[in-house]
């Protein structure tokens, strides 16, 4: 599965969600297009061409993670975000770096499985409906008690068996009627008893998350749960709920997990994107103290980025063609502080700019998922048509920029805290007030946020 989008189209798609940062968008668009170009080459040349990994440099909240995440969604590529600070050098307490590849494969399996389930959705629903009819019209089987073996072998059909045949015919007619009612949606609220498989918990939870288990690439909990017999539990639920449970069970039976696993590994190897955040936190110059461990983390990451084979519970995974995007603010350190070998593995460097007032204005109104649109939609559920005036939007953007400059610069995330504070009273009272339309004006913004923004000490705690 490879995207046929051109770099220009990729940038246009990213523009729907992310404001500015054209340099970063162009770099990731070219990296993605090169993957498509690589698939068109003959196998010998294809193996030689590896992705050009990207290093994004810029403060928090300017769109580094969002660019990578949206890029992965565009092409249905497996994507994970990890933080470099969570890893430690081999021998220290903490996650080993190979776990990022295992997490990527898990993400890939989940992605492929969801796609396969979607393909068999209609068939699974039909099978679920058949099972529902069986639950709604249970069989009328009668046990015949024989006095001796000869009676069982040589007994003739009697009147009771003829009656059973009539009952079976009546039951078939009833099933047809029930099927029709089920199709019309007349039985959705009726209650049925469904037998569901119960998850095995208990002592197996002890095996979760052990660093040693991660290094073995094995999931002990899953292994033990497969050894334990599956428990069945009866649950009463409505037909509507039961259809969902039964359809899920039937879908699991219809998909071939071996095929899913194989496809997931291929997709992780060829299309996978690993986003390593806070890479600057493991960069250090000195050879003493914590920096020794930091350099150890870099040296452990190096073979993964260079290309190696990692053993996972689904099989061996090669990392040669996985795209790595590293990101960091680099306030205290510089990219040159990374070990030279790792620097060489991230040939494309992109600097993301801090956000200006105009950027904040665009972020508030332009993207498809803009914050103002989200809050307007939320209050619409209470019957209130809320709108932000252009002056109010610019005022919010100005305050966000000022607070970022005076306190910690957290980029666009500042808008979340500002809008939450701005609409706090309105969100609380919305269910009780009767307003059809409401406009958020510049004066209202000044009244709610002006004093906090001006008071530097207070803004550090509230905003």
Swiss-Prot record:
InterPro entries: AAA+_ATPase, ATP-dep_Clp_protease_ClpX, ATPase_AAA_core, Clp_ATPase_C, HslU, P-loop_NTPase. CDD domains: RecA-like_HslU (cd19498). This is ATP-dependent protease ATPase subunit HslU. It is found in: Cytoplasm. ATPase subunit of a proteasome-like degradation complex; this subunit has chaperone activity. The binding of ATP and its subsequent hydrolysis by HslU are essential for unfolding of protein substrates subsequently hydrolyzed by HslV. HslU recognizes the N-terminal part of its protein substrates and unfolds these before they are guided to HslV for hydrolysis. Keywords: ATP-binding, Chaperone, Cytoplasm, Nucleotide-binding. The gene is hslU. It comes from Shouchella clausii (strain KSM-K16). GO terms for molecular function: ATP binding; ATP hydrolysis activity; peptidase activity; proteasome-activating activity. GO terms for cellular component: HslUV protease complex. HAMAP family: HslU (MF_00249). Belongs to the ClpX chaperone family. HslU subfamily. A double ring-shaped homohexamer of HslV is capped on each side by a ring-shaped HslU homohexamer. The assembly of the HslU/HslV complex is dependent on binding of ATP. SUPFAM superfamilies: P-loop containing nucleoside triphosphate hydrolases. GO terms for biological process: protein unfolding; proteolysis involved in protein catabolic process. ATP binds at residues 19, 61-66, 277, 341, 413. Its main location: cytoplasm.
């Amino acid at each position: 599965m490879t995207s046929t989008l051109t770099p220009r189209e990729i940038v246009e798609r990213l523009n729907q969600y992310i404001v500015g940062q054209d340099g970063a968008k162009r770099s990731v668009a070219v990296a993605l297009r090169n993957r498509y170009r690589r698939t068109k080459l003959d196998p010998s040349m294809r193996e030689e061409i590896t992705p050009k990994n990207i290093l994004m440099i810029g403060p928090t909240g300017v769109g580094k993670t969002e660019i990578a995440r949206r890029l992965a969604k565009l092409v249905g590529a497996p994507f994970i975000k990890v933080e470099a600070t969570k890893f430690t050098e081999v021998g220290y307490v903490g996650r080993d770096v190979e776990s990022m590849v295992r997490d990527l494969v898990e993400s890939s399996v989940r992605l492929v499985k969801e796609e396969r389930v979607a393909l068999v959705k209609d068939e699974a629903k039909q099978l679920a409906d058949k099972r529902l009819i069986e639950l709604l019209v249970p069989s009328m089987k009668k046990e015949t008690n024989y006095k001796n073996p000869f009676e069982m072998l040589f007994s003739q059909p009697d009147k009771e068996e003829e009656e059973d045949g009539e009952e079976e015919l009546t039951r078939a007619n009833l099933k047809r009627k029930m099927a029709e009612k089920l199709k019309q949606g007349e039985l959705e609220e009726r209650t049925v008893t469904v037998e569901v498989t119960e998850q095995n918990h208990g002592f197996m939870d002890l095996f979760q998350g052990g660093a040693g288990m991660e290094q073995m690439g094995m999931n002990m909990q899953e292994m033990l749960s497969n050894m334990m017999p599956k428990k069945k539990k009866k649950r009463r639920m409505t037909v509507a709920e039961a259809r969902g449970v039964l359809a899920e069970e039937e879908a699991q039976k219809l998909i071939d997990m071996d095929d899913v696993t194989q496809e997931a590994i291929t997709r992780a190897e060829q299309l996978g994107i690993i986003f390593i955040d806070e890479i600057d936190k493991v960069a250090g110059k000195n050879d003493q103290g914590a920096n020794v461990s930091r350099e150890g983390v870099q040296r452990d990451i190096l073979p993964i980025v260079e290309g190696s084979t990692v053993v996972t519970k689904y099989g061996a995974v090669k990392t040669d063609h996985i795209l790595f995007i590293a990101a960091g603010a680099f306030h205290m350190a510089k990219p040159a502080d990374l070990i030279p070998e790792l620097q060489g593995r991230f040939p494309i460097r992109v600097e993301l700019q801090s956000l200006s007032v105009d950027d904040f204005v665009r972020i508030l109104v332009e993207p498809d998922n803009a914050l103002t649109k989200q809050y307007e939609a939320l209050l619409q559920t209470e019957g209130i048509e809320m709108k932000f005036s252009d002056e109010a939007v610019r005022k919010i953007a100005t305050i966000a920029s000022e607070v970022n400059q005076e306190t910690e610069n957290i980029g666009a995330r500042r808008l979340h805290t500002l809008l939450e504070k701005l609409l706090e009273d309105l969100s609380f009272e919305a269910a009780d007030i009767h307003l059809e339309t409401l406009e958020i004006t510049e004066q209202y913004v000044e009244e709610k946020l002006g004093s906090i923004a001006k008071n530097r000490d207070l803004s550090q705690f509230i905003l």
